[in-house]
Amino acid sequence: MNLPIPFCTYTKQLMGDALFATLCEGLEDTPPVSIRMNPFKSKGAGACPTDTTPVAWCQEGVYMASRPNFTFDPLLHAGLYYVQEASSMFLAHVLRRLVHRPVVMLDLCAAPGGKSTLAR
Protein backbone atom coordinates (compact mmCIF):
# COMPACT_ATOMS: atom_id res chain seq x y z
CA MET A 1 0.00 0.00 0.00
CA ASN A 2 1.36 3.39 -0.95
CA LEU A 3 0.49 5.82 1.81
CA PRO A 4 1.13 9.55 1.33
CA ILE A 5 4.52 10.60 2.71
CA PRO A 6 3.09 13.41 4.90
CA PHE A 7 0.70 10.88 6.47
CA CYS A 8 3.55 8.44 7.17
CA THR A 9 5.77 11.16 8.67
CA TYR A 10 3.01 12.49 10.91
CA THR A 11 1.78 9.06 11.98
CA LYS A 12 5.29 7.76 12.77
CA GLN A 13 5.87 10.78 15.03
CA LEU A 14 2.53 10.14 16.72
CA MET A 15 2.84 6.36 17.13
CA GLY A 16 6.54 5.62 17.06
CA ASP A 17 8.31 3.33 14.59
CA ALA A 18 7.25 -0.02 16.10
CA LEU A 19 3.54 0.77 16.30
CA PHE A 20 3.59 2.39 12.86
CA ALA A 21 5.15 -0.80 11.43
CA THR A 22 2.33 -2.80 13.03
CA LEU A 23 -0.22 -0.45 11.45
CA CYS A 24 1.37 -0.91 8.02
CA GLU A 25 1.34 -4.71 8.42
CA GLY A 26 -2.34 -4.58 9.32
CA LEU A 27 -3.14 -2.44 6.30
CA GLU A 28 -1.41 -4.98 4.04
CA ASP A 29 -3.39 -7.94 5.43
CA THR A 30 -6.52 -9.18 3.74
CA PRO A 31 -9.44 -7.90 5.82
CA PRO A 32 -11.55 -10.56 7.54
CA VAL A 33 -15.02 -11.22 6.16
CA SER A 34 -17.78 -11.66 8.71
CA ILE A 35 -21.49 -12.27 8.40
CA ARG A 36 -24.36 -12.23 10.84
CA MET A 37 -26.81 -15.12 10.56
CA ASN A 38 -30.54 -14.38 10.71
CA PRO A 39 -31.69 -16.46 13.73
CA PHE A 40 -35.24 -16.60 12.36
CA LYS A 41 -34.19 -18.17 9.05
CA SER A 42 -30.92 -20.00 9.65
CA LYS A 43 -31.81 -22.82 12.05
CA GLY A 44 -31.71 -25.77 9.64
CA ALA A 45 -28.71 -27.84 8.61
CA GLY A 46 -26.87 -26.34 5.67
CA ALA A 47 -28.24 -22.86 6.32
CA CYS A 48 -24.84 -21.46 7.32
CA PRO A 49 -22.14 -21.08 4.68
CA THR A 50 -19.36 -23.64 5.12
CA ASP A 51 -15.83 -23.06 6.42
CA THR A 52 -16.66 -20.47 9.08
CA THR A 53 -15.32 -19.57 12.53
CA PRO A 54 -17.55 -18.14 15.28
CA VAL A 55 -17.28 -14.48 16.27
CA ALA A 56 -16.51 -14.66 20.02
CA TRP A 57 -18.93 -11.93 21.12
CA CYS A 58 -21.90 -12.68 18.86
CA GLN A 59 -23.80 -15.96 18.79
CA GLU A 60 -25.07 -15.27 15.26
CA GLY A 61 -21.76 -13.97 13.90
CA VAL A 62 -19.20 -15.97 11.93
CA TYR A 63 -15.98 -15.20 10.07
CA MET A 64 -15.72 -16.67 6.59
CA ALA A 65 -12.48 -18.31 5.44
CA SER A 66 -12.65 -16.41 2.15
CA ARG A 67 -14.80 -13.74 0.57
CA PRO A 68 -17.39 -15.28 -1.75
CA ASN A 69 -19.13 -13.43 -4.53
CA PHE A 70 -22.11 -12.37 -2.41
CA THR A 71 -24.03 -11.20 -5.47
CA PHE A 72 -24.59 -14.81 -6.55
CA ASP A 73 -25.23 -16.36 -3.12
CA PRO A 74 -28.86 -17.48 -2.81
CA LEU A 75 -28.51 -17.70 1.00
CA LEU A 76 -27.84 -13.95 1.16
CA HIS A 77 -30.77 -13.14 -1.11
CA ALA A 78 -33.04 -15.43 0.93
CA GLY A 79 -32.18 -13.40 4.04
CA LEU A 80 -30.31 -16.18 5.88
CA TYR A 81 -27.43 -13.83 6.64
CA TYR A 82 -26.21 -10.27 6.25
CA VAL A 83 -22.64 -9.18 5.55
CA GLN A 84 -21.59 -7.25 8.65
CA GLU A 85 -18.20 -6.34 10.12
CA ALA A 86 -17.67 -8.25 13.38
CA SER A 87 -16.95 -5.06 15.33
CA SER A 88 -20.50 -3.90 14.51
CA MET A 89 -21.80 -6.96 16.36
CA PHE A 90 -20.09 -5.95 19.61
CA LEU A 91 -22.79 -3.52 20.75
CA ALA A 92 -25.30 -6.31 21.39
CA HIS A 93 -22.71 -8.10 23.57
CA VAL A 94 -22.15 -4.97 25.66
CA LEU A 95 -25.87 -4.29 26.05
CA ARG A 96 -26.54 -7.86 27.25
CA ARG A 97 -23.99 -7.32 30.03
CA LEU A 98 -25.20 -3.87 31.09
CA VAL A 99 -28.97 -3.98 30.64
CA HIS A 100 -30.92 -6.68 32.45
CA ARG A 101 -34.23 -6.30 30.66
CA PRO A 102 -35.35 -6.81 27.06
CA VAL A 103 -33.87 -4.31 24.62
CA VAL A 104 -35.42 -3.44 21.27
CA MET A 105 -32.72 -2.80 18.66
CA LEU A 106 -33.14 -1.21 15.27
CA ASP A 107 -30.21 -1.77 12.93
CA LEU A 108 -30.26 0.52 9.90
CA CYS A 109 -28.05 0.61 6.87
CA ALA A 110 -27.77 3.07 4.02
CA ALA A 111 -25.87 2.80 0.76
CA PRO A 112 -23.02 2.94 0.15
CA GLY A 113 -22.14 1.56 3.58
CA GLY A 114 -23.38 3.80 6.37
CA LYS A 115 -24.69 2.09 9.49
CA SER A 116 -26.84 3.34 12.36
CA THR A 117 -28.13 1.55 15.42
CA LEU A 118 -30.96 2.57 17.72
CA ALA A 119 -31.51 0.86 21.10
CA ARG A 120 -34.54 1.38 23.27
Enumerate the language-model features and the residues they cover:
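S-adenosylmethionine
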Residues: M1-R120
